[in-house]
Amino acid sequence: NDIESMQVLKDAASASIYGSRAANGVIILTTKHGKKGDKKVDVDFTTNLTAQFYTSQSKMKLLDSKGYATAMAQAALNDGLDPVAYASNYGLNLNATEGFGIRAWNPATSQYVDYTVNGLYDGYINSKRTMRLSDTDWVDAISRTGFSQNYNVAVSHATDKSTALFSIGYKDNKGILKYTNFQSLSARLNTSFIINKVVSVGENFTVTYNKQVDCAPMENALKMSPTVPVYEEDGTTFAGPVGGMSDRQNPLRELYHNKDNHLDYWHLFGNAYVDIKPLKGLTFRSNFGVDYTTSFINALTHTFHSDIVNNNIAKTTLGQTNNTNYTWSNTLNYLFDLSKVHHFNVLLGSEINKQSVVDFQAYSEGYALEDVNYMWPNAATGTMSNSGAKFGYRLASFFGKIDYNYNDLLLASFTLRHDGSSRFGKNHRWGNFPAASLGFRFSQLLDKKWLNDAKLRLSWGKTGNQGIDNNAHFGLYVTDYGLDRVTSTAYDLYLQGSGTFPSGYRATQTGNDNLKWETTTQYNIGLDYSLFNYSLYGTIDAYIKNIDDMLINPAYIAVMGEGGNQWSNGPSLRDWGMEFTLGYRKTLECGLGLDINGNLDFYRNKVTSLPSSATGS
């Protein structure tokens, strides 16, 4: 509810000023702020019930127990096997005196064969006689009706020299899978102050706390045999596969044992700025933004016994990740006019961005008590291990932009960026990315009442992509004690066979000092229009996008030995296509706003070149 407007920039000329992080386009979100007037309090509450609804077309058709037994018998007959013996491996008796009937076609005799199905052990599918033959819909067994609540309160106020908005929100979402939920508490403060005629300051910060219990047992629910019950006969022990069945986990047990494995996630996001206007039309802005996240989880693995599937050791895996990302940008913007019809907007700027990630994990096993408050490493009696890493990257940019507007009839823009990234090799760390656009609002030359706005636009631009590992251009080496005596990096110089040995290193990646920016060059031609008092609107857009020096990490043949893995610049790709959007908006007499829109697009792509190292490989 804090979002006031959203804008999507897809063509290279519009997105180029944002640099490499705009390689796939830009979404601009404008958050709400205080508006001049009296103090205002907004309260919003929504609630939803959610459930899994299926139609005959959308639902995956799963076999019930009768269909499962029929398919099993038919498969055995098709392979020339004895269906009775075959089914016994799965806890089924096809020659039972009572149960449900099935029929299968015997290709050897060209006749149907009838069977009566029940559990192999007097109605039970396991020899312990704890799991009776069932007809379980596992998707239904793990599902429930979800329930979500959202509460939002916002207080805003503004004067001639200041604006302020404070909002707080709470969300509670119980998922459609049992024992899953998501809770979120957020707060945002957005203020601005005019200190004097020259200086103004402002900030916009949001802090969010999320608590999430998530699990993904759907694959097991879809593949688990319907003949297996949810619980054993005691009603509390989770059932599981038997005999020749695959070792699928009971999906409801997965959900139940995962209920305490919640991920705690804090997120601080925002920026603070200062504007200085020493001269008319001239503005200097310094903006510092931070994006900080920290997450923690203590993932418990409980002991359980589900017939042939079991776990006898209680385990925990602790994980904590801190991600700090800050951006400091400084811009100088000058707006001026010539002859009242020529309008110019000149922008010069620089920006530095730094990301740092610290990751830590600890593993321990062997607990006398399986409780979320007890299962911490200090209480473990078995194996313990830990791991951790720190990584990040830096990005520096210099950019300039000139916008020209002739009487709102002719529009032109030119942008140039010079970006440098620590992710690339020392020989090609920096890249230049220009862009230009031209717009012609020809509706001003046509005296048509039904035509409110029509603009033809052309654009061309280059953007860079640095979406690779932070250590992509380095040669990497690691120690590894976990391998056997032959392949381990430890040196057993005296052939002891055990103990602590001095260690060497093995290569895991070959460096590449010539690794460079992936570049996208895009051409666009389009038409934007609004008709009939702006009620009918739309766009027509055609584009060609050429991607050169694609960043790839290809597979390598084994004869290259250790460290054959290497990042490189690979093939070139061409995308081309068209996009159409059409919308209709109207405000009804009752004050209700109506906005209906849709889009249609098509595209093609083609690999236009391959590097010599890849040709014929």
Where are the language model's segments positioned?
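Short beta-strands and strand-coil junctions in structured, solvent-facing domains, enriched
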Residues: 12-17, 34-37, 51-54, 174-176, ...
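Non-catalytic regulatory/gating segments with a bias toward low-complexity or hydrophobic composition
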Residues: 6-7, 27-29
